[in-house]
Curated annotation (Swiss-Prot):
InterPro entries: Asn/Gln-tRNA_amidoTrfase_suB/E, Asn/Gln-tRNA_Trfase_suB/E_cat, Asn/Gln_amidotransferase, Asn/Gln_tRNA_amidoTrase-B-like, GatB, GatB_Yqey_C_2, Gln-tRNA_amidoTrfase_suB_CS, Gln_synth/guanido_kin_cat_dom. It catalyses: L-glutamyl-tRNA(Gln) + L-glutamine + ATP + H2O = L-glutaminyl-tRNA(Gln) + L-glutamate + ADP + phosphate + H(+); L-aspartyl-tRNA(Asn) + L-glutamine + ATP + H2O = L-asparaginyl-tRNA(Asn) + L-glutamate + ADP + phosphate + 2 H(+). This is Aspartyl/glutamyl-tRNA(Asn/Gln) amidotransferase subunit B. It comes from Ureaplasma parvum serovar 3 (strain ATCC 700970). Keywords: ATP-binding, Ligase, Nucleotide-binding, Protein biosynthesis. It comes from the Bacteria. One of its GO terms (molecular function) is asparaginyl-tRNA synthase (glutamine-hydrolyzing) activity. Allows the formation of correctly charged Asn-tRNA(Asn) or Gln-tRNA(Gln) through the transamidation of misacylated Asp-tRNA(Asn) or Glu-tRNA(Gln) in organisms which lack either or both of asparaginyl-tRNA or glutaminyl-tRNA synthetases. The reaction takes place in the presence of glutamine and ATP through an activated phospho-Asp-tRNA(Asn) or phospho-Glu-tRNA(Gln). The keyword Ligase applies. GO terms for biological process: glutaminyl-tRNAGln biosynthesis via transamidation; translation. Heterotrimer of A, B and C subunits.
Length: 477
């Protein structure tokens, strides 16, 4: 690849997290029974007219602001994109072809060489989704729950140069969508769907190579696989002196290859025209300024805040990649006020526990999170040790019992009375006079030995902090 340069552009469709659809009052949900969240507008019944969902427009403007874009708020208009397919009841899709809601923005990434790189975003525009199509055998099943769901399409310039850069761009975009409450950005639910355009040109050439589009990639890992395969495929053609044809392809995750769909000659003429049933929306500068008083969430600012709390980079990226986990982390840390301890017990231990049970953090109640917070406080106060905390955490999850009750039930109550601990020390020291005589020469080794002895004697029920402080007093007399 030293003699060639890869050119990648990306188009992302993100489903907005609004309560209702884009042009009707039907509800939105990924989990409902098929064809139960529909009305006459979604089915394009005669005589129905679309009404623009105000929240969709607000989210579009808010995303444009978060992506540093110029907004077309003074003239928000819609267009018809014509094509005929089973998933499109009207025979056209309502979109924004001529006046996209946001233009000329960017996302910054740290590239593979640790350099800050700006990826330009050409535009974002609002549009409605189509019905969901499922093929089973020779049958085609359509779920119109998705028809009319509001989407934003995000179109980048061809600034990406590798699969890795593309993944970094998508991960950063996903965080912006999550933390600005635009979308849940769950690729597994179809809330984030990705098309990539890949071409290759000789190093130093100014003209782009022949572009190949790969449609509807359903996971970030598959985006990387699709790009890497397509680079190899095109490079092999070039090295064999064969032409790269302009095509639309899809990614087959069974074979990890891209598969031909159609050529440029088969390209559809969408016959865009203005949507006459929706009057243009004119928003004043003052109106939009008031909207933007709620500042868009900067992912880099969040990174800095988490770093100041002492979290390492991998922990920060885990939290920023999972909105519900970040929310749970903030909730628990507000009670505990120890970010490192909360991260260990909530984001590592507890997440590992619920993953084994195929549950996600969104299903965990505030009541259970409060109990986990109380458990972490007990650990931080050294009233339970690490081994005991792991056992209690699992019991909290399985039984929903309070940690204090579990401590009693499991026999984990600590000995904290100084007089009782002093008696135990005298008993231990009397049996270990030879070790006691070595204290002045090797204090650390002797202290470690005696702490081990009291833990053995009490089956780890002596409070370690109190025990150590009492031991120091005795040894220094």
């Amino acid at each position: 690849m030293q003699n060639f340069e890869v050119i990648i552009g990306i188009e992302v469709h993100t489903a907005l997290n609004t309560k209702t659809k884009m042009f009707s009052n039907a509800a939105t949900s990924h989990k409902s029974i098929p064809n139960t969240l529909i009305n006459e507008i979604d089915l394009a019944l005669p005589g129905t007219l679309p009404t623009v969902n105000q929240e969709v427009v607000h989210k579009g403007l808010f995303l444009a602001n978060a992506l540093h874009m110029r907004t077309n708020h003074q003239f928000i208009a819609f267009d018809r994109k014509h094509y005929y397919y089973l998933d499109l009841p009207k025979g056209y899709q309502i979109t924004q072809n001529y006046f996209p809601i946001g233009q000329n923005g960017y996302i910054q990434i740290i590239d593979e060489y640790n350099n800050l790189k700006r990826i330009r975003i050409k535009q974002i525009h609002l549009e409605e989704d189509t019905a969901k199509q499922t093929n089973i055998g020779n049958q085609i099943y359509l779920d119109y729950n998705r028809a009319g769901w509001p989407l934003i399409e995000i179109v980048s310039e061809a600034d990406l140069r590798s699969a890795q850069e593309t993944v970094l761009f998508l991960e950063e975009l996903r965080k912006i969508l999550l933390f600005n409450d635009i979308s849940d950005a769950k690729m597994e639910d179809g809330s984030l769907r990705v098309d990539v355009n890949v071409s290759i040109r000789p190093q130093g050439a100014k003209k782009f190579g022949t572009k190949v589009e790969i449609k509807n990639i359903n996971s970030i890992s598959n985006v990387a696989k699709a790009i890497d395969y397509e680079i190899r495929r095109q490079l092999n053609l070039i090295l064999l002196n064969q032409n790269v044809e302009q095509q639309t392809r899809r990614f087959d995750d069974n074979t990890n290859t891209t598969v031909f769909m159609r050529s440029k000659n088969d390209a559809i003429n969408y016959r865009y025209i203005r949507e006459a049933n929706i009057a243009p929306i004119h928003l004043s500068d003052d109106y939009v300024k008031k909207m933007f008083l709620t500042k868009s969430c900067s992912i880099n600012d969040l990174r800095q805040q988490l770093a100041q709390k002492g979290l390492v980079s991998s922990a920060i990226e885990q939290l920023l990649s999972d909105g519900p986990l970040f929310k749970a982390f903030k909730y628990v840390d507000k009670i505990v006020n120890n970010p490192l301890s909360v991260y260990k017990w909530l984001c590592l231990e507890f997440i590992g526990l619920i993953n084994k049970n195929t549950q996600n953090i969104e299903e965990i109640t505030p009541e259970l999170l409060q109990k986990i917070a109380r458990m972490i406080l007990l650990f931080d106060q050294t009233l339970i040790n690490g081994k005991q905390t792991k056992i209690i955490l699992e019991k909290i999850y399985l039984t929903n019992k309070d940690p204090q009750i579990l401590i009693k039930e499991l026999g984990f109550e600590q000995i904290t009375n100084e007089n009782e601990i002093t008696k135990l020390w005298h008993q231990i020291l009397a049996k270990n006079q030879e070790m006691l005589l070595q204290y002045n020469e090797r204090p650390d080794r002797v202290e470690k030995f005696f702490m081990g002895e009291i833990m053995k004697l009490t089956k780890a029920q002596a409070n370690p902090t109190i025990s150590f402080n009492v031991l120091k007093k005795i040894l220094q007399k």
